[in-house]
């Protein structure tokens, strides 16, 4: 079984093809493991589709399925073009979402995430029980729960340096309380936003999270009056341009091919697939 490794904004993914829908959860856990596998934030399985150029099944590194992953959408778009599965401009199905892809040479990929949904606005008081003494999060007056394909909790700090002082245990508690990824961000100016994301399914900070960047972008736009186009800078420092248009949220940034790996037959005998 052949896996192609791609990276987008600091997220890395293993991409493979299958002609049938199967449960790849165990396989995802093994191949995404950083020490015992090839190492990746997630596994993308590209499948044939009657109505679209292709569709995918996406798995987090812990084997859980997710309907959407923003940076993976750009990576799989580049993969599909480079492997003659789809043209430069195409549409694929991610769960129930139609994702449009546009590739600009040599490796700039734009994807349309589609629409978003504001699920809730959460005052600080509802979260205080999860904070430790002198918590960075204490001074965030309001959190925003936003669905950009998967749910994200977003809060803004007033000092960029605080992004490096976040408490993993606090974010993990919030992640389980709201069953969402946790994003803490700083608006440097109206068009530049820094963020850190604690991602469910990875259960730790990640170098980047596309849907998390989208949620932060929307929260900043709606509640902090930022413009319809901004640059988001995650932990990886690989920036992503986000824009809001009539038909949804658009990502635009670099995606790159890293390498290829081949999985031997031993994994099949061990019952991992």
UniProtKB/Swiss-Prot annotation:
One biological process term in Gene Ontology: lysine biosynthetic process via diaminopimelate
Pathway where this protein functions: Amino-acid biosynthesis; L-lysine biosynthesis via DAP pathway; DL-2,6-diaminopimelate from LL-2,6-diaminopimelate: step 1/1
InterPro entries: DAP_epimerase_AS, DAP_epimerase_DapF
GO cellular component: cytosol
GO molecular function: diaminopimelate epimerase activity
EC numbers on record: 5.1.1.7
Binding site for substrate: 11, 60, 70-71, 181, 199-200, 210-211
Catalytic residues, chain numbering: 69, 209
Site positions for Could be important to modulate the pK values of the two catalytic cysteine residues: 152, 199
NCBIfam families for this protein: DapF
Function recorded in the entry: Catalyzes the stereoinversion of LL-2,6-diaminopimelate (L,L-DAP) to meso-diaminopimelate (meso-DAP), a precursor of L-lysine and an essential component of the bacterial peptidoglycan.
Name of the protein described by the UniProt record: Diaminopimelate epimerase
Organism: Helicobacter pylori (strain J99 / ATCC 700824) (Campylobacter pylori J99)
């Amino acid at each position: 079984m052949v896996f192609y490794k791609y990276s987008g904004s600091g997220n890395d993914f293993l991409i493979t093809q299958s002609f049938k829908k199967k449960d790849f959860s165990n396989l995802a856990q093994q191949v995404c493991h950083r020490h015992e596998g090839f190492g990746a934030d997630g596994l993308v399985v590209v499948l044939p589709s009657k109505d679209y150029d292709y569709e995918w099944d996406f798995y987090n590194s812990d084997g859980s399925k997710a309907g959407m992953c923003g940076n993976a959408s750009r990576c799989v778009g580049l993969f599909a073009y480079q492997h003659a599965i789809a043209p430069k401009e195409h549409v694929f199905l991610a769960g129930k979402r139609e994702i449009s892809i546009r590739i600009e040479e040599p490796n700039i990929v734009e994807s349309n995430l589609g629409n978003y949904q504001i699920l809730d606005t959460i005052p600080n008081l509802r979260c205080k029980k999860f904070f430790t003494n002198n918590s960075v999060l204490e001074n965030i007056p309001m959190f925003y729960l936003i669905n950009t394909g998967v749910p994200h909790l977003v809060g803004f700090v007033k000092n960029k340096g605080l992004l490096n002082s976040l408490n993993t245990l606090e974010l993990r508690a919030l992640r389980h309380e709201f069953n969402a990824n946790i994003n803490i961000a700083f608006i440097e100016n109206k068009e530049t936003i820094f963020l850190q994301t604690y991602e469910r399914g990875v259960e730790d900070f990640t170098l980047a999270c596309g849907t998390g960047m989208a949620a932060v972008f929307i929260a900043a736009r709606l509640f902090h009056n930022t413009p319809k186009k901004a640059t988001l800078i995650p932990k990886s420092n690989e920036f992503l341009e986000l824009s809001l248009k009539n038909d949804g949220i658009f990502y635009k940034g670099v995606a790159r091919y890293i390498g290829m790996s081949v999985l031997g037959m031993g994994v099949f005998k061990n019952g991992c697939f």
